[in-house]
Amino acid sequence: MSEFITVARPYAKAAFDFAVEHNSLDRWQNMLTFSAEVTRNESVAEMLSGALAPETLAAFFIDICGDQLDESGQNFIKVMAENGRLQVIPDVLQQFIALRDAMEATADVEVTSAAPLTQAQLDKISAAMEQRLSRKVKLNCKIDKSVLAGVVIRAGDLVIDGSIRGRLDRLTDVLQS
């Protein structure tokens, strides 16, 4: 977790509240996602850590984002630039998504498998996790050959390791003790 998370929280809350009030959650998430990608660019990161005046920095950033930012998004960037906080936009995005997930009662579930899963398998995992977590889930699938077979499911602090690699690791621990 980033050291900027505490700084990012009030900005994320303000953006989230504005987006809810104006029924524009998708638009705001897209603007924040694009802005976060811009801040990750090496050239932009150097500019953010430089000694540019806030107005110049905001204008530069808004110019790079182009039509990806509407007027309210541009105002948000100006406020963040005035306070020297543009580098925390990725953390603002993370907090914004967390607030949205909490409001929509959804949870991100990461499913790691050795091979692509069928739609039937994904549906079964989704249904089981929705029942276990008592909320809707969004599956994010990854392929990792090191799991050998089976799946590893992560949802927040919950980890369900049904992989062959996990079983072998547990067997090794038992044999060594």
From Swiss-Prot:
It holds the Pfam family OSCP. It is found in: Cell inner membrane. GO terms for molecular function: proton-transporting ATP synthase activity, rotational mechanism. Signal peptide: none annotated. The lineage of its organism: Bacteria, Pseudomonadati, Pseudomonadota, Gammaproteobacteria, Enterobacterales. InterPro entries: ATP_synth_OSCP/delta_N_sf (IPR026015), ATPase_OSCP/d_CS (IPR020781), ATPase_OSCP/dsu (IPR000711). It is a peripheral membrane protein. It comes from the Bacteria. This is ATP synthase subunit delta.
